[in-house]
Design a protein with these regions (language model features):
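C-terminal non-catalytic regions of proteins with extracellular/luminal or membrane-system context
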Residues: 1-514
Length: 514
């Protein structure tokens, strides 16, 4: 059996699972002790008999409860711990690291590249932002990554041939070494560590400008199981979120300065903090060529990147795993041509999203019968899903067609959006229908001067009758990505789907119609 590492959160979780069983054993122990004490009142033969019987009774209850625990609540845990473990070969480990890097090669999304600023040759580069020294590698809970052995953003840049400004990175590490924990069991610390602009001395900035005329700003946001992202940071900072719970619904935030608050009431976690906004202002006032890297899986408000002519390029890089940040360096250098696409719609103002009022920390007030069993110290929480079929891009595309929103004013980056260092042309062939299966050929030609991959996305618009079955105006039904295409070369992709894939469900008449 291989080495088993145990995290404190795992211990807490196991204790919570068997809490009722432990209470039963504890009650049996108390009863045994009471009987042994009371037995002192009886004569010696009876006293001994009662004590032995109480001990045997306690032992029997303990054995039964422990067996129930092992068969029930702890069954899966024991299987994980006691099961035979295979050894991971070095070859498989190396292959896994390579796969992680390849996934990031395919997934990083470039959303802005004014003046074709990227790619740039490996050179000296100033990397600003505390997150550059402590990036997001994955989600929370089961999505965590061992950061101690992972390739970070700075290391990924250096592996690609860039030289980073160590005076900046040393300052960030000295400011704070660890990332605030978003814990399932111990509450959530939503603090966004960032060195206040006032702490950047004239010497540091003069040295940075002498080091390189190019700056890269890294901003990150974490998120995962255990808590919704706060949409009112003011309530997090003033502690009012504590009113509805003490565990899953608990949140805290520590400001980066005593001179101001990082967030005002009503601002969400996915907006720039005051310290981050000051950092962007400072960097853009000192450097003409700025790259922004957003490291996070959630759709942050990025409209501010359009307010600075100095911000030439924007890259979206979610949790990159153990080795994925090598890909980020390779994309900036041009070793890899970005081909990722957005997996959600990025909006300019999150308060205008259809789900905004239905997310957050909502708690039931009439659940006394189940509250005792709730993990959140008696708090039973919920989230409302009211969007129906209009989730993600389906809402924005349909709302724009119906005149409910102005698409350009609302949407920052559409679903399926992403830029490349080259250009492509796509030519769609005729639809072929055979026994309910539909295929179509799409020929992609690299019309630029740089090798790269392109993504073909096939959408359909179903017929809609006012008052009929709800249907979104645009629906993704198939997609594929080309191989690396050299300039002037083409590749034909065949996309296929079934007619049934375009069917709609009548939730009121309970009958499927196409």
């Amino acid at each position: 059996m291989g080495n088993v590492t145990v995290a404190w959160e795992d211990v807490i979780s196991v204790i919570q699972m068997v809490r009722t069983h432990l209470i039963v054993i504890g009650a049996a122990l108390v009863c045994m002790i009471l009987l042994m004490v009371l037995a002192r009142r009886w004569a010696k033969p009876l006293r001994g008999f009662i004590r032995w019987q109480s001990f045997i009774g306690f032992l029997l209850i303990t054995v039964i409860v422990v067996n129930v625990m092992l068969i029930g609540a702890l069954n899966n845990t024991l299987n994980v711990v006691l099961a035979d473990r295979g050894e991971l070969s070095q070859e498989n480990a190396d292959n896994s690291r390579q796969v992680i890097e390849e996934i990031t090669n395919e997934g990083v999304v470039m959303t802005k590249n004014d003046e074709d600023f990227l790619p740039i040759e490996p050179q000296k580069i100033n990397v600003f932002g505390w997150a550059s020294t402590n990036p997001i590698y994955g989600g929370t809970g089961s999505g965590t990554v061992d950061a101690s052995t992972a390739v970070g953003i700075l290391e990924g840049l250096e592996n690609a041939g860039f030289e980073t400004n160590t005076e900046l990175s040393d300052m960030y590490r000295e400011y704070r070494e660890d990332r605030p924990a978003i814990s399932i069991n111990d509450g959530q610390d939503w603090t966004l560590p960032e060195v206040p602009v006032a702490d950047y001395s004239d010497t540091i900035m003069e040295n940075a400008k002498a080091f390189s005329d190019t700056a890269l700003i890294v901003l990150s946001r974490t998120g995962g199981e255990g808590a919704d992202l706060p949409h009112d940071m003011g309530s997090i900072m003033d502690g009012s979120t504590m009113d509805v719970g003490t565990k899953y619904l608990r949140g805290s935030y520590t400001n980066n300065s005593d001179e101001y608050a990082d967030f005002e009431a009503g601002q969400s976690y996915l907006e720039l903090s005051r310290t981050e906004a000051d950092l962007v202002d400072m960097v853009c006032s000192q450097f003409d060529n700025v790259i922004v890297v957003y490291n996070g899986a959630n759709t942050m408000e990025l409209g501010w990147t359009e307010n600075y002519d100095q911000i030439k390029s924007v890259l979206l890089c979610a949790g990159a795993g153990a080795t994925g940040f090598n890909a980020l360096g390779n994309i900036i250098s041009g070793e890899v041509n970005p081909s990722g696409r957005t997996a959600d719609t990025w909006v300019r103002d999150l308060t205008q999203t259809p789900y905004y009022n239905n997310i957050g920390h909502f708690a039931y007030t009439n659940t006394e019968d189940v509250a005792a069993a709730a993990q959140a110290d008696g708090i039973v929480s919920f989230v409302n899903y009211n969007e129906g079929i209009y989730t993600g891009y389906r809402f924005y595309e349909t709302a724009a067609e119906e005149g409910l929103i102005n698409y350009e004013d609302t949407v920052m980056y559409p679903f399926g959006y992403g830029m490349s260092y080259t250009t492509f042309e796509q030519t769609m062939g005729d639809l072929n229908v055979t026994e309910g299966a539909i295929t179509v050929d799409v020929t992609v030609t690299n019309t630029g001067d740089t090798p790269g991959k392109d993504v073909v996305q096939l959408y359909y618009t179903p017929p809609y009758t006012n008052g009929g079955i709800e249907k979104s105006s645009v629906n993704l039904i198939a997609f594929d990505k080309t191989d690396i295409l050299e300039p002037g070369t083409s590749q034909t992709l065949t996309l296929s789907f079934d007619e049934e894939d375009m069917a709609s469900y009548d939730t009121y008449g309970r009958r499927g119609t196409s």
